[in-house]
Each structure stands twice: as C-alpha cells, then as structure tokens.
C-alpha cells in the first residue's frame, strides 16, 4: 500500500516537473523570438538604405516643399492661403521646365487694385510654395500695368502697414520679398511714397546692421531717393544718418 502511494506521488511530481519544463521552454522561445525581431528592426534602421533616406539630397533645394492649396491642411490656413484656395486671386501658377510663371484669368490691366494689390502684399509674408511665388510675382506684375500709379497711390495708407509687416518679419526671405516690393512700389508712385517712408525706415535701419543685408538695403535706399527726390533724401538721412546719397 505504501509502495502504491509512493509511486503515485512520484508520478505527480514528474508530471509537475514536466509541465514546469514546458513552460520554461516556451518562455525561452518567446524571449528568443523577441530578441531576433529587435535585432532585425535595429539592422533595418541602421541599414545604408535608411541612412540615405535620412540624408537631405541636393535636389531638395531645387524642389521646395509644396502645399496643395486645394487639399486638406493640417492647421488653419493663413488669410492669403484661404483666399487663394477659394479662387480669390485671379491667377494661377504654371510650372515650367526652367522657370515658373503666372497665368492670369483675365488681363491684369482690367483688374481692380482694391483689394487685390493689398491681398498680394499680405501674401509676401507667406513662407511656403506656391504662395510665396504667387504673391511676389503677382504684386510685381500688377504694378507694371498701364495706369498703375493712379490705382496704387490711393491705397498707400493701407498698403504701407502691410509692407512694414513683411519688413519686420523674422524670416529673411520674407524680408527680402518685402524690400523688393517696396522698391517696385517706389518706382510706380514716386514722391507720393515720401509721406510714408518714416514708418518703413526704422525696420530697414535695424536690418542694416546685419552684414548680409547691408548691400541690398543700401541699393533699395538709393532707389527710394532716386524716385522720391530731394525730399526723400532728407527723410532717409533723418532715420539713417550713415546713408550716403547717390548725389555724393
């Protein structure tokens, strides 16, 4: 009787031991699989192909990041982007093999400057393509039409604060577009710009301390003097005493 009980106890212990061995073996296999998967994942991440994808390519500069103005945006669009996507700007960007251009829905000569010119000036603060190109080129082409001075001069009180916003922008490219637009405007409106110069010269004076902007700002000031006359020179010198006149 004792032998039977002993034999039964041994069998139970053997079964328990076998079950423990199976669980231990199963756990070891799972750990091994996890280690292999992590190893594969690590090797894929550190592979030469992944490294090539992470490095920027020279062609990235030639193909700026573009937003689809008609697609879903991850964040609320700017005022200019919203107007453009709704067809409020009567022109579209045409991509060329060498350079881009604007295609107007109707001749720019018949378009009202109010509010189109101001809207394009507001777009100068955009930082993404195609808005940057559309605003800059649209502003330039609109000022080239016949009768531009008569259309632009009445808008100066509303246009100047918008240009100033571009000139005080922290983005260097936005500042450069604002500076270029200011020169284009001075060519068209001439001395009519003099009454608004003081509002703009403060931001130019601050940027003038940056070496990379010294030459383009000096050139812009010379254009302002050229088209604004002697009165503009007095205003420029009052805000930027170091400015050297083109008459010197």
Swiss-Prot record:
The keyword Hydrolase does not apply. Keywords: Acetylation, Phosphoprotein. The keyword Acetylation applies. It comes from the Eukaryota. The modification Phosphoserine is found at residue 47. The modification N-acetylmethionine is found at residue 1. Residues 14-29, 36-45 have a biased composition (Polar residues). Residues 1-72 are annotated as: Disordered. This is PACRG-like protein. It comes from Mus musculus (Mouse). The gene is Pacrgl.
